Amino acid sequence: MTALPMLCALLTVQQTPFTVGPVTARPGERASGYLGVPAGVDSGTRIPITVIRGARPGPTVALIAGTHGVEVAPIVALQRARAAIDPAALAGTVLMVHVANLPSYLRRTVYYSPIDGKNLNRVYPGRPDGTVSERIAHVITTEIIDRADYLVDMHSGDGNEMVRPYAYAGRLGLDARTDSLSREIALAWGHTRIVIDTERPRDPAASVYTQNTAHLRRKPAITSEGGYLGLADEEMVQHNLTGVLRLLRHLRMLPGAPDPLPAAVYFERTEVVRSPGTGIWYPAVAEGQAVAAGSVLGVLTGFFGDTLAVLRAPFGGVMMYVVPTPAMNQGEPVGMVAVPILAP
C-alpha cells in the first residue's frame, strides 16, 4: 500500500504530545478546544477542534466539517467519530475541525458568511489581516492544513442543494504522488463517483479552495460531497462516519483489515450551470439524472410568473447536484453536469 513506507519510517520515532493552538493531546489521548480567530476589520470568531493523538506514531489526517454553515451531516458525523476513535488503538494523529465556519453555522446561512458575505471555500489560504472568512482560512491553513499529511474537506448538500455522494480529487500534474494518493483516499473513503479536478489554481498563495490548499502543499486531499437541504439525515451521517473509519483503517491508523477499494466511475469534464437572473427557480431534473446536451434543466421566472430564462444542459452528462429550492440569485448555481470518462 502506498502509505505504508512512510508509516513504517514513522514507527521508529517516539510519540510526543501534539499541540494545535491551545489544544494539546498527549499520546493515547484526545483533547478538544477552540482555535481563536481574533477580531480585525470585522468581528472575530472561534473554531472548535479535536486532536486525537494515537498511542503509536503514524500519519496525521485532517478532517474538516462545517465550511458552509448549513452542511450539517459531516458536523454530526465528526462528533460521532470523535467518540468512536480510540486514541489507545490509534497510530498517528487525527485533527478534527468540527465547524470551520461558526458564524455561518450559527446564523444558518447558505454559501456565504453573515459577517463579510464571502464563501469560506473561495478565500484560501486566507490572510491574517483580511475579513473574518479570510482570517478563518488563514488559521485553518496554518494550524491544520500545514500540520497534516492527508486532508478530507467534508461537505454535504447546503440548505438549497441536493447532492449525490461523490468526491473531488485533484490531478494538477505538479506531483504525481499527490495526484495518485488523492484518488486513493477518495476510494478508501468509499466513494464510487470521483470528479478528477484538473483546473484548480496552481499558485499556493491563491489556492482558493480548502482541498486545493492541501494539494498544492503536496498533501493528498479530497472534497467529499453528499446530502441534501441542510439535513443531518442518518444515511449521510453514516456515509461520512463510515468514510472516516474506512480511511483510517486504509492508512493503518486503526486496527482491522482495510476495506476493499470500490470500483468507481470517474468524471473529468464538468460545468456548473449558473442562473442568469434573480427570481423563482423551477427545476426540471434531479441529482443523479442523465441529461442530453440541450435538455431543459429548469425555468427561471420573475416574481409575477414571467419567464426570464430556460436553462439547458451545456453537454450530455450526469447531474452531480441540483438546486431544487425556488429562491435564486443571479450568478448562483442551479446544478452541475459532469461527463463520465473511462479512466482517470
Task: Explain the meaning of each model-derived region.
Residues 2-12:
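Sec-dependent N-terminal signal peptides
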Residues 11-344:
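Structured catalytic-domain cores with a bias toward divalent-metal coordination
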